[in-house]
Structure formats: structure tokens, C-alpha cells
């Protein structure tokens, strides 16, 4: 290659580098957040609005939201938010599935509700993954985000939110 051709290549490469620098390069962003919920014993606790309120403050328009609960005796579910009978029936079903009977379990040191709480947690979810499109969480018309508390006494629960997107 002669010097003129080499110089031409250098000029061409320099122009390409300038073009690349001028282009806006978008990177994926990540944001972490914790929602603290104080429960008053067994039942479902809707945290949809708290999550949506936090999402509305973020700069991310499209992405994935992962929510996980940092406990082994409560869980997360997406469930109908229109008819409270659904939540009542679900709680009753799980109470029958994992009854509070000390004779059934070895792990009873934290109370009669402890092992049934672990079973219910194992059968449901400890994390949820949802899509975010145009700053809107993709949920069905009747869907809400719930913490499903399996213990009888009040607890403070931590829900870790991890949003990834652009």
C-alpha cells in the first residue's frame, strides 16, 4: 500500500470515528428500589399503586421489572383485584393445603404457622417479572400485585424492585 492510500484510509477511519461519536448511543439503565410493607397477619396486601408510583418517577420507558420478596414465609402473586372473594377463596384453599397441625411437621420452633407458611411460599412465587412498555406496566385489566402473607402475626416485609431498560 502506498503512502497516499494509507493516508486515505486514515482520513476515512477518522471520519467514521467522528460519525460514531455524533450518533447518540443509548445504554440500558438499571434502577433498584425497595418497598417496605407492614403486614397485620395472614392475607393479601396490594402493592400495585406503590410500584406504579415508583415506576412513574423513573426515566426508563421500556424494559423489565423484577420484584422479589426477601423472606421465606410470605410470597408474591399477581391476582384479580376486582372481587375480594377471589383472595378470600385463595387464602382458604392454601390454609387447607398446608394446615396448621404440629403433628404434621418437624419444623415447629417458630410456631404452628411457620412450616405451613414455608410450604405456601414454596408453592407460590418469591419473585415476579413484568414488562414495561411506554412507561406502563403490562398488567391485565383485573390484575394486581400482591404480597401474600402466610404468618399469623404482623411482619415487616421487604420487596426488592430491579428495573432494567431504556
Can you annotate each of these PLM segments?
Residues 2-166:
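Active-site histidine-anchored catalytic micro-motif
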Amino acid at each position: 500500500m502506498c503512502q497516499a492510500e494509507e493516508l486515505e484510509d486514515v482520513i476515512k477511519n477518522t471520519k467514521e470515528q467522528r460519525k460514531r461519536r455524533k450518533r447518540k448511543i443509548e445504554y440500558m439503565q438499571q434502577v433498584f428500589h425497595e418497598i417496605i410493607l407492614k403486614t397485620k397477619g395472614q392475607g393479601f396486601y396490594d402493592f400495585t399503586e406503590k410500584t406504579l408510583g415508583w415506576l412513574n418517577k423513573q426515566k426508563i420507558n421500556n424494559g423489565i421489572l423484577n420484584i422479589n420478596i426477601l423472606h421465606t414465609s410470605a410470597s408474591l402473586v399477581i391476582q384479580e383485584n376486582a372481587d375480594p372473594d377471589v383472595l378470600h377463596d385463595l387464602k382458604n384453599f392454601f390454609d387447607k393445603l398446608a394446615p396448621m397441625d404440629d403433628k404434621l411437621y418437624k419444623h415447629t420452633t417458630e410456631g404452628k404457622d411457620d412450616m405451613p407458611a414455608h410450604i405456601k411460599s414454596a408453592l407460590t412465587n418469591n419473585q415476579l417479572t413484568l414488562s414495561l412498555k411506554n412507561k406502563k406496566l403490562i398488567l391485565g385489566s383485573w390484575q394486581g400485585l400482591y404480597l401474600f402473607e402466610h404468618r399469623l402475626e404482623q411482619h415487616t416485609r421487604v420487596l426488592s424492585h430491579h428495573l432494567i431498560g431504556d
